[in-house]
Amino acid sequence: MVAQAPHDDHQDDEKLAAARQKEIEDWLPITSSRNAKWWYSAFHNVTAMVGAGVLGLPYAMSQLGWGPGIAVLVLSWVITLYTLWQMVEMHEMVPGKRFDRYHELGQHAFGEKLGLYIVVPQQLIVEIGVCIVYMVTGGKSLKKFHELVCDDCKPIKLTYFIMIFASVHFVLSHLPNFNSISGVSLAAAVMSLSYSTIAWASSASKGVQEDVQYGYKAKTTAGTVFNFFSGLGDVAFAYAGHNVVLEIQATIPSTPEKPSKGPMWRGVIVAYIVVALCYFPVALVGYYIFGNGVEDNILMSLKKPAWLIATANIFVVIHVIGSYQIYAMPVFDMMETLLVKKLNFRPTTTLRFFVRNFYVAATMFVGMTFPFFGGLLAFFGGFAFAPTTYFLPCVIWLAIYKPKKYSLSWWANWVCIVFGLFLMVLSPIGGLRTIVIQAKGYKFYS
């Protein structure tokens, strides 16, 4: 019996380690709740994908022109739907295991360390970048609402509106996981469809403007080319929900007989139909009505009736509240995983309270300091949006499944990779030029 003791101790240690691991997984935001319905994934995906950037699509069309504009809109929709399908398929490709996080899939494809180095920095650039942009967008939309509703009120700085917007997140960020924010996400998804409908329906009711022109606005060839690159980025990065798709799928229950990919794919299809209903009418109707004179936010071109534009701005605020939460959740998960697994903090509500408040405060501070952050993201985001959305899923697919050379799957993946690389190189050039031109007007804490 004495000889058996070390073996028993070893088994006990393993059991303790497994129990601790399960306790941590049951606490972390991505894996703590796995009882989501398929329609949860639909509105989470709509909220993640339809950004306030949809209101800038007519302006992007004016930089691209009819032919290239429609081509990029449709190509981006098709390619990103294909890469999203790949990620949904790969979530449970290893029997008995789920890749609940983007970097776990990367680690399976490229190795433990390399997978982390490839995926995590890009995912963080997108998620933290989007959260900061939404801080500014929420603040700007609140400011616009205030100006429209109370036109003789004393002007209030954008900084204060960003603080007001952030105050909501100091409360909502303490909802523990994706399923607990499903109500917020549903409201956000409905709002995105609502303000998109207001944008294109109001434009259509105005009728085509007199002296409307559809040619390129820039006077020089260089200006036209740079604007084209910028418009390319604006359209392509309107589809950026891939950064949170595995994390959303992780909330859906799964068994060998009924894997999660069925309900998840149903949700994705519904989400993509809603995305098409938001993007295509806004982009095409907005450009058709206003031509190349359209503002970079179509609501600015509409101006009247003031009550309707004010309503649309409040809808934008509600939508970006939901979007912020969707993009913040994987970051909360990474921070909490690091503290609990690597630094051995105990998984407690107090820890979560400090971590999440710190994150909201940090994104609020950056948004207040750099209210022109959206211009910066067009540049930096190009290096992260294109890979995570357009070609990283294809590279992972090729690495794992190794389809036969020159087969349909092989060609489809390589077309997506080339298109994604093309975006990654060209769109930041347009973004950089925008920064250079607008830098004179950049003011900190405006």
From Swiss-Prot:
Transmembrane region(s): 38-58, 64-84, 116-136, 158-178, 181-201, 228-248, 269-289, 306-326, 353-375, 379-401, 410-430
Subcellular location per the Swiss-Prot or TrEMBL entry: Cell membrane
GO molecular function: amino acid transmembrane transporter activity; symporter activity
Keyword Iron: no
GO cellular component: plasma membrane; plastid
Induction: By amino acids.
Lineage top rank: taxon: Eukaryota
Topology versus the membrane: Multi-pass membrane protein
Tissue-specific expression: Expressed in roots, stems, flowers, leaves, siliques and pollen. Found in the tips of roots and in the rhizodermis of emerging roots and in lateral roots. Higher expression in older leaves as compared to joung leaves. Detected first at the hydathodes, then in the epidermis and finally in matures leaves in all mesophyll cells. Not detected in vascular bundles or in seeds.
Keyword line: Amino-acid transport, Cell membrane, Membrane, Symport, Transmembrane, Transmembrane helix, Transport
Regulation: Inhibited by carbonlycyanide m-chlorophenylhydrazone (CCCP) and DEPC.
Family, similarity comment: Belongs to the amino acid/polyamine transporter 2 family. Amino acid/auxin permease (AAAP) (TC 2.A.18.2) subfamily.
Functional summary from the UniProt entry: Amino acid-proton symporter. Transporter with a broad specificity for histidine, lysine, glutamic acid, alanine, serine, proline and glycine. Involved in both apoplastic transport of amino acids in leaves and their uptake by roots.
Protein name, UniProt field: Lysine histidine transporter 1
Organism this protein belongs to: Arabidopsis thaliana (Mouse-ear cress)
Lineage: Eukaryota, Viridiplantae, Streptophyta, Embryophyta, Tracheophyta
Gene: LHT1
